[in-house]
């Protein structure tokens, strides 16, 4: 409604109100004394007027009836405010109507929808055909969502891809690989930070073909863990953690004696716990420890497992008394460990793979610092300086060791 029309409407209301007032004055002059006339109450218009009512009448010294014109002005102001709000709402609706048609084009562009058909694999063509049927973006952490993303129930698969697409460069032509070549390629790609996203996309492009292969399943779950680490958005991290956990749980059910399935289930339980309350954190902590121990029995020569076990022990050793008490109240037992136990696991990782990682050296330095063995702490800080800094975790570990070295040299 144009602003000029608003003005005309308000002016009309004011003229009408003035006319009613004159009519009332005329009526009171000709009516019999003592007869009162009541004005009807205004009906509530939602909560806008807060049930504003007109008082019946009052008389001045000469007995002349005076209508509460202030009330009338308040009502007019409310009407004007309502009309203004309606105009703003109409403007917002108009904006949305213009924006919505562009949304599909934007999404398809982000997903590589402008790539010509002859350059897209059959898997991608099927994916693009389903895109117009998508009506909403699924971001819940339900198991159904995870099954969909993993390729085991495909109804919502494209919705997930639409929610958190990987860079467009990886949505180009898909190279069909056999299982052995695919596994070798994704293992090689994830050795670098930049290759992890490509590794994830490569696995996702082959999920329909190798969905029932155990070696594929646990690597796909691992890739979701990689995407969790790479993401900086909380909702994306939660999305990747929950789907990865469900995929790794399914892998365990299919292959309970495969240590990698237990390893990545433990890791993803740890990631999921970051978004939970205290009770669920403790519950996931028990799951982490349980499946990590199983994985160590099945893969006794895997240094990563001992590094994770060391981190668990170190974290538990640092729990406050109140945190341990709450855990005992909720679960009937207190998680317990010591710095010495953590140190043992970190040393085991170093024994299996000398120079295993910057973070492992950092925790070795922390353990020795806590045990007041400063020379050993400095030794591992210096060894860490010889290692390349590749990942974000490496960089954070280097910064922490610089702090440790500074504090030890004081």
From Swiss-Prot:
Annotated GO CC locations: cytoplasm; cytosol; Golgi apparatus; membrane; mitochondrion; mitotic spindle; mitotic spindle pole; spindle microtubule
Matches recorded under SUPFAM superfamilies: TPR-like
Which regions span the lipid bilayer? 9-28
Membrane topology listed for this record: Single-pass membrane protein
Write down which residues bear the modification named Phosphoserine: 51, 121
Which parts form a coiled-coil structure per UniProt? 68-110
Q: Which InterPro entries match?
A: RMD1-3_a_helical_rpt, TPR-like_helical_dom_sf
Phosphothreonine modification sites are: 139, 154, 157
Tell me which domain of life the UniProt entry assigns to the organism this sequence originates from.
Answer: Eukaryota
Annotated localization: Membrane; Cytoplasm; Cytoplasm, Cytoskeleton, Spindle; Cytoplasm, Cytoskeleton, Spindle pole
Q: Name one GO molecular function term.
A: microtubule binding
Keywords, sorted A to Z: Coiled coil, Cytoplasm, Cytoskeleton, Membrane, Microtubule, Phosphoprotein, Transmembrane, Transmembrane helix
* Pfam families assigned: RMD1-3
Can the keyword Nucleotide-binding be found in this entry's annotation?
A: no
Q: Would I find Coiled coil among this entry's keywords?
A: yes
- Region entry Disordered: which residue ranges? 122-164
Composition-biased stretches, type Basic residues, lie in 122-131
Phosphotyrosine is found on 152
Q: Read off the PANTHER family from this record.
A: REGULATOR OF MICROTUBULE DYNAMICS PROTEIN (PTHR16056), REGULATOR OF MICROTUBULE DYNAMICS PROTEIN 2 (PTHR16056:SF15)
Describe its assembly: Interacts with microtubules.
The entry assigns this protein to a family as follows: Belongs to the RMDN family.
Please state what the protein is called. Answer: Regulator of microtubule dynamics protein 2
Its ancestry begins with: Eukaryota, Metazoa, Chordata, Craniata, Vertebrata
């Amino acid at each position: 409604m144009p602003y000029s029309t608003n003005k005309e409407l308000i002016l009309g209301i004011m003229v009408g109100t003035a006319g009613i007032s004159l009519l009332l004055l005329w009526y009171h002059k000709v009516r019999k004394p003592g007869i009162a006339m009541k004005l009807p109450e205004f009906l509530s218009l939602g909560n806008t007027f807060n049930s504003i009512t007109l008082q019946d009448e009052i008389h001045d010294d000469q007995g002349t009836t005076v209508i509460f014109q202030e009330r009338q002005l308040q009502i007019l102001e409310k009407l004007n405010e309502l009309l203004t709000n309606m105009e703003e709402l109409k403007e917002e609706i108009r904006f949305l109507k213009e924006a919505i048609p562009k949304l599909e084009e934007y999404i398809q562009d982000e997903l590589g929808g402008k790539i010509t058909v002859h350059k897209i694999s059959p898997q991608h063509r099927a994916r693009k055909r389903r895109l117009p049927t998508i009506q909403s973006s699924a971001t819940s952490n339900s198991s159904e969502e995870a099954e969909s993303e993993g390729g085991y129930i495909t109804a919502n698969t494209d919705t997930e891809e639409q929610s958190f697409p990987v860079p467009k460069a990886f949505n180009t032509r898909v190279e069909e690989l056999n299982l052995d070549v695919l596994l070798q390629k994704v293992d090689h790609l994830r050795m670098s930070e930049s290759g992890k996203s490509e590794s994830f996309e490569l696995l996702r492009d082959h999920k329909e073909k190798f969905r029932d292969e155990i070696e594929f399943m646990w690597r796909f779950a691992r890739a979701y863990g990689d995407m969790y680490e790479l993401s900086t958005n909380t909702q994306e991290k939660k999305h990747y953690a929950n789907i990865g956990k469900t995929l790794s749980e399914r892998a365990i059910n299919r292959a309970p004696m495969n240590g990698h399935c237990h390893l990545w289930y433990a890791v993803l339980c740890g990631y999921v716990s970051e978004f939970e309350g205290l009770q669920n954190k403790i519950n996931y902590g028990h799951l982490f420890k349980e499946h990590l121990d199983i994985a160590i029995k099945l893969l006794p020569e895997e240094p990563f497992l001992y590094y994770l076990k060391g981190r668990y022990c170190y974290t538990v050793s640092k729990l406050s008394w109140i945190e341990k008490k709450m855990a005992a109240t909720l679960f009937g037992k207190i998680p317990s460990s010591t710095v010495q136990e953590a140190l043992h696991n970190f040393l085991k990782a170093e024994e299996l793979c000398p120079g295993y990682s910057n973070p492992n050296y950092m925790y070795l330095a922390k353990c020795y610092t806590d045990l007041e063995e400063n020379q050993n702490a400095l030794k591992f800080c210096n060894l860490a300086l010889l290692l390349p800094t590749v990942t974000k975790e490496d960089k954070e570990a280097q910064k922490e060791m610089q702090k440790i070295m500074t504090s030890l040299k004081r």
